[in-house]
């Protein structure tokens, strides 16, 4: 009987002790940590970031071709991915007359990368630089627009439109 009482006492003490252990708050915490970096690309022109959404690109008359024509300086892509594609959203480049007429100027648009001229309505793959200090003529791109006809064929007036350049990171 004494052995049974002793065993019951030990079991009761163990149960009370185990209950006390379970009532102590756990001092271990699991932290689930995660981070996500999204692709970022900035468009630079003449070694400066293009802030804002508009960029003026006048088309003067070229003294040799006698067409409305302009070729930009170099654009560069700066960001945290290796490559990106650029393309203009529009399939046609048309400058309507702003005031007093129905005349318009059709333009051909092109990209010039590493001396090769390509259609600007087709995607062009370009390197994305980590810093503007890496910019060279071989990793930049120029944009060129030229009118379909000689400037003298168009009615006198102002012609204007906005075209959208899309920059898409390649992940």
Model-derived features with residue positions:
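Short, surface-exposed beta-strand/strand-loop-strand elements in extracellular ectodomains
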Residues: 105-113
